[in-house]
Regions:
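Gly/Ser-rich oxyanion-binding loop with an adjacent helix/lid
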Residues: 76-152
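ATP-binding N-lobe of GHMP and related small-molecule kinases
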Residues: 1-92, 106, 110, 114-116, ...
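Glycine-rich, charge-dense phosphate/pyrophosphate-binding loop(s)
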Residues: 206-298
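Anionic-ligand binding region
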Residues: 144, 148-154, 173-204, 214
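Short beta-strand segments
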Residues: 9-11, 27, 138-141, 147, ...
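Short beta-strand-to-loop capping motifs
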Residues: 38, 170, 261-265
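Glycine-rich beta-alpha junction loops
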Residues: 30, 142, 169-174, 221-222, ...
Length: 298
């Protein structure tokens, strides 16, 4: 059992990239770092004001994940003080809940000496999230493509792609449950085939570093964009502006409400500045894909 303090660093993520709905994730260069030290009772201290509304006791998602992960293996963990530093916008489509879950799994693994395999961690995180896209990328880094059911899990990983990323963050957060409530219960067989083809071609294009084709396919999503785009002010205008400045493609980041824009490498700062000026009610953040996933430092 771990007694001395340690830290866990986990990247932000974006999910779907359009038609890769619920199975494609990409780690991003924004990060959450959690320092864990023994304490008499569980206490979470957030250093970022945006997280001030979150619970700081055992009801916190990170603590719940730690306890549930340990309990799966009939282990209990001693209380900790968790000091959290994060530059990941909360509830804005950048996998903040998946980051918390990934961190909790890693902390439980360390505190209870569970010696979990990568697949163990991926299965636990995906079960807790209900889908595999964000949490696999948070745990492994790079880009992940997952097949996940109650009985089976398969994950392929790709290195972080050589692109720049711009995230357009709106001023209002959107709960994932609300966003999922906008989706239809069914698609026709013909629609499903079209969506699957777009996702397959996009993934193949990314694997071949063909981001021109990948960007086009990002914008061919039929699974969620048509139903969720109504919640984004100036959605079509932003997409047109992205094309004007040479972006590969633009789509909704995860369940929203942020937008993910793939751009040629080393242009993300310039594109972010242009979009920030043109759409001031959004915050344009320049970043890159992240190679590394969750990491423990002693």
């Amino acid at each position: 059992m771990a007694e001395a303090g340690f830290s866990v660093t986990v990247p932000a993520t974006t999910a779907n990239l359009g038609p890769g709905f619920d199975h494609l994730g990409l780690a991003l260069s924004l990060k959450m770092k959690i320092e864990a030290t023994p304490a008499l009772a569980w206490f979470i201290q957030y250093h970022d004001k945006e997280y001030a509304s979150l619970p700081t006791d055992e009801t916190n998602l990170i603590v719940q994940t730690i306890q549930q992960t340990a309990a799966r293996y009939d282990q209990a963990v001693a209380p900790q003080k968790l000091v959290v530093y994060s530059d990941i916008p909360l509830g804005k489509g950048l996998g903040s809940s998946a980051t918390a879950i990934a961190a909790g799994i890693e902390i439980a693994n360390e505190l209870a000496d569970l010696q979990l395999s990568k697949l163990d961690k991926l299965c636990i995180g995906s079960e807790m999230e209900g889908h595999a896209d964000n949490v696999t990328a948070a745990l492994l880094g790079g880009m992940t493509v997952s097949y996940f059911t109650e009985e089976e899990m398969e994950v392929l990983t790709f290195p972080a792609p050589p692109i720049g990323v711009v995230i357009m963050v709106p001023p209002v957060a959107l709960k994932t449950e609300t966003s999922r409530g906008l989706l239809p219960e069914y698609l026709t067989h013909k629609e499903a085939i079209r969506g699957s083809a777009a996702g397959s071609l996009m993934t193949a294009a990314i694997a071949n570093s063909d981001w021109v084709t990948a960007g086009r396919m990002m914008e061919r999503d039929i699974y969620h964009e048509p139903y969720r785009k109504i919640g984004f002010p100036n959605f079509d205008e932003i997409r047109s502006a992205c094309r004007e400045v040479g972006a590969y493609g633009m789509t909704i980041s995860g369940a929203g409400p942020s937008l993910f824009i793939a751009v040629p490498p080393e242009t993300e700062q310039q594109v972010a500045a242009l979009l920030d000026q043109r759409f001031p009610h959004y915050q344009a953040i320049a970043m890159q894909p992240a190679e590394n996933g969750a990491c423990v430092t002693k």
